[in-house]
Amino acid sequence: VKELDLAWSFKFDTARGMEATPIMHNGVLYVSTGWSHVHAINARTGAELWHYDAEVPKAHLAKTCCGPVNRGVAIWQKDEMSPLQVFFGSLDGRLIAIDALTGEENWSVQSTPTDGNYSITGAPRIVKDMVIIGNGGGELGVRGYISAYDVSSGEMRWRFYTVPGDRNKPQESEALEKALS
């Protein structure tokens, strides 16, 4: 241990502290930072391979409780013949798929309503060819849910509400009906 030394360091262009854990795949670190930026960094040299900026409007900060944070990415590849993709949620509620080799956007979907205090700060998960993502904003009174999107197309497969909606309207499930009784 006493012979260990710093191999390299990388300065992210953000004044906000980092809350994401990098993911490493084939010698590349993928990490998200504040304001919905994603970086691919060569793990051996520390050289930036690409940088993606979701270009979230600064005015969206007013719709969040806890600052312009982003807590991580997910990576997925169906097989060796398929493209490796990086997925993350943007502060303004989009779920975005990026080509892991080039940093180019493959697709983007608006996962949250644009007229409320919704955001996405959490990292997505990949399950059975679906990207699973939740929403943020519960601290500001929005309704929570978890959604699944097709990894290839971005088409929504399902949405599960975690809290009941308007008590004067039918709920999406028996469990939500029981929660109101």
List the model feature ranges, each with a label:
Residues 12, 37, 57, 81, ...:
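Surface-exposed, flexible loop/turn segments at secondary-structure boundaries
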Residues 98, 102-103, 144-156:
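Beta-propeller blade signature
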Residues 1-2, 10-14, 24-28, 34-35, ...:
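Acidic, proline/glycine-rich low-complexity intrinsically disordered segments
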Residues 1, 24, 42-43, 90, ...:
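Short, acidic, Ser/Thr-enriched surface-loop or helix-capping motifs
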Residues 33, 42-45, 52-56, 77-79, ...:
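Generic hydrophobic/packing signal
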Residues 93-94, 99, 103-106, 132:
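Accessory beta-strand-rich segments of carbohydrate-active enzymes
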Residues 1-12, 47-62, 104-113, 155-163, ...:
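Aromatic (tryptophan-biased) beta-strands that constitute blades/sheets of beta-rich domains
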Residues 17-37, 63-94, 119-143, 180-181:
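Repeat-blade elements of multi-bladed beta-propeller folds
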